[in-house]
Amino acid sequence: MDFIFKCVSGNEIVFKGLDTEGKVKGIEGYKYLLFDELDHYLREEWNQANISLRGMPGMKLFATWNPVSEKLWIKGYLDSMEWDDMPLVIDDDPYTQLHHNSFVRRSKDGKTILIKTTYFDNKWAVGGEGYGFLDQNLIDEYEQLLLLDPNSYRVNVLGDWGVPEVSRPYCQNF
């Protein structure tokens, strides 16, 4: 099923499910493709999408994921590239300032941008000067997670790569 958002300008944003490999191979007429939760896809599926869209002017692949394990193919893929750090703020605009635990990097070949953000960058949770709001309950939950499950805190709060742990397998099964 497709979901289509029509903008006032007349542009459309089309959300199309690509839940089978055949759909990715047959995609036509799209310039942008978003993989939400890339950690749930195989490297081969990412490669197939890249091949399917190659040659289209302005084609871009986007992906979001949580770095749940340093053993994910994504980490190896990113580690194989060389990166340049980019500024954490655009034109001294405080609304674009990223937290010190975040980063923006561009691959040396200029084909890939990597942006790491955390909840500290979400001004609708942590508040901002003149905008957003402070969600103290959410912040308290995140900070409690540090005490209960440091690995989950590292992944879900700080956005760092997770390290598989088996020290408390009973607790993590329930």
Predicted regions: what they are:
Residues 11-12, 31-32, 57-63:
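Loop/turn-to-beta-strand initiation segments
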Residues 29-46:
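SF2 helicase catalytic motif II
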Residues 37, 50-54, 149:
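Long, contiguous amphipathic alpha-helices that act as assembly "spine/axial" helices in icosahedral shell
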Residues 122-174:
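ATPase catalytic-site recognition across NTP-hydrolyzing enzymes
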Residues 24, 74, 157:
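Short clusters of hydrophobic/aromatic residues that line enzyme substrate/ligand-binding pockets
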Residues 16, 114, 172:
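Alpha-helix-centered segments that form part of catalytic cores
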Residues 1-31:
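Inter-Walker segment of RecA-like/P-loop motor cores
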Residues 42-139:
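ASCE P-loop NTPase helicase motor core
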